[in-house]
Amino acid sequence: NKAKNFINLTNIDFLGVSIGNVHMFSKGNYNPQLDLLSRINEIVEIPLVIHGTTGFPEDKIDLAIKNGVAMFQVGTIIKETFFNEIKKNIQNIKIIDNVHDYVGSRKEKDFLEPGKSKIIDLISKYINLFHSNNKKNLYGK
């Protein structure tokens, strides 16, 4: 009932819920309280949001969606993936003849490009996991 009262008081469009998820979680997995999510979804009439999706079990995502989750906030795993790939690649640079080739050039030597490629793959995976692909027709465009 606190959730419903909060929604009525603030007139928000989405509700971020705490069901065992941890914002900026980075190590291991957690067990989301899907029974609590289900109860919240029965009470409120707006879409729910999960902050702290890193560590959310992939096999529970469909159930979370069925229980009202319309948005998953994924940041930590994307940042870690990008950072780790850059760290790995920057260690391979021995001689820098032209710094511009290595930073932001989008050329073969650019140490940022492998990180970018890794997060594109990761984000594509999440788009499919969250069933967020092929939604353009929902917006009449």
Q: What residue spans do the PLM features occupy?
A:
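A near-ubiquitous, low-amplitude feature marking generic local secondary-structure context
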Residues: 23, 47, 69, 102-109
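Short beta-strand/loop segments at the ligand-binding rim of alpha/beta enzyme cores
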Residues: 42-52
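Extended, intrinsically disordered, low-complexity segments
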Residues: 91-141
